[in-house]
Curated annotation (Swiss-Prot):
The keyword Lyase does not apply. It is found in: Host cytoplasm, Host perinuclear region. Belongs to the geminiviridae protein AV2/V2 family. Interacts with host SGS3. One of its GO terms (biological process) is symbiont-mediated suppression of host innate immune response. Keywords: Host cytoplasm, Host-virus interaction, Inhibition of host innate immune response by virus, Suppressor of RNA silencing, Viral immunoevasion. Pfam families: Gemini_V2, WCCH. This is Protein V2. Through its interaction with host SGS3, acts as a suppressor of RNA-mediated gene silencing, also known as post-transcriptional gene silencing (PTGS), a mechanism of plant viral defense that limits the accumulation of viral RNAs. The keyword Secreted does not apply.
Length: 115
């Protein structure tokens, strides 16, 4: 869960609680598919906990809370249909193979020589 060789131990009790909360949320995050509302909400909550400035934390929490109140429990596992613009989403890192219209397909031509 927490590796003392890789990470420093938090200096305050609040820092320790935040570290445990983030580790727990990362485990919960693994139970959701990356293209669901629940996954996005958990990522938002992790960003709320990681914010250092009180103003930034308040702004992120207000955004998170408004999204959470607007969602029913059944919607958390449903795929998102709206597109978001954040670069850290796994669904933005997928490469889509698209067939280009201007490139003709190659066809196999049978041998037409007669013996």
């Amino acid at each position: 869960m927490w590796d003392p060789l890789l990470n420093e131990f938090p200096e305050t009790v609040h820092g320790f609680r935040c570290m445990l909360a983030i580790k727990y949320l990362q485990l919960v995050e693994n139970t959701y598919s990356p293209d669901t509302l629940g996954y996005d909400l958990i990522r938002d909550l992790i960003s709320v906990i990681r914010a250092r400035d009180y103003g930034e934390t308040s702004r992120r929490y207000c955004h998170f809370h408004s999204r959470l109140e607007g969602a029913s429990p059944a919607e958390l596992r449903q795929p998102l249909y709206g597109s978001c613009c954040c670069p850290h989403c796994p669904r933005h890192q997928k490469t889509n193979v698209v067939k280009q219209a201007h490139v003709p397909e190659a066809h196999d031509v049978p041998d037409v020589q007669k013996p």
